Amino acid sequence: MPFELTVRYSIPLTPLTDVDEVLREFLSQIGYLSEGADPEATDGSVAYRLMRDCLLRHPDRLWYPEELTAVLKTSKPTVYRHLNRLKALDLLEEVSEAQEGGKGRKGFRLRYGNLGRAWDFVEANAQNALKRYRETVDHLGRLLEDERKPTVPPSSSKGKPSS
């Protein structure tokens, strides 16, 4: 799954003291929650409750999709849609457990069981992505520079006056 993060310039949310307000704004800034949504609607959304009530409240716990479906009172596809968005941010780790009969069971938890450490992973991915963009921009600049260089026509002895 490709790494995806919305990056926009914003001021730190450190003046805010309400954890739900900070979390709502932060999750909107990084592209996990819809921007500009009504706070009451957001707090009741599956996406928000998955983060707030499950992953952040119990960061070390391994959550199974069936459990999340029951806790969040929603469908399995909805749970997976939000899990996949968090996986794209690289905030989640996926753990497979072998069960009897050979079929594995997947569980999910906040990476490293800690939001700060999980965010370190996100930052590293973002830095790598920006570095690759820089390499592409530099390469594109060189190609454009080469394209602008005047081309010298091949020298020819025809048409020159003889001495």
Q: Which sequence ranges carry the predicted segments?
A:
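N-terminal leader segment of winged-helix/HTH proteins
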Residues: 1-41
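Alpha-helix N-cap/helix-initiation sites
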Residues: 39-44, 61-62, 76
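Short, cationic-aromatic polyanion-contact patches
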Residues: 43-47, 97-124
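Short, locally clustered residues in the helix-turn-helix/winged-helix DNA-binding domain
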Residues: 51-59
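Short acidic, hydrophobic short linear motifs in intrinsically disordered regions
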Residues: 59-70
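Short amphipathic alpha-helical interaction segments
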Residues: 73-88
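A short, conserved structural fragment
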Residues: 87-99
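Amphipathic alpha-helical dimerization/coiled-coil segments
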Residues: 116-163
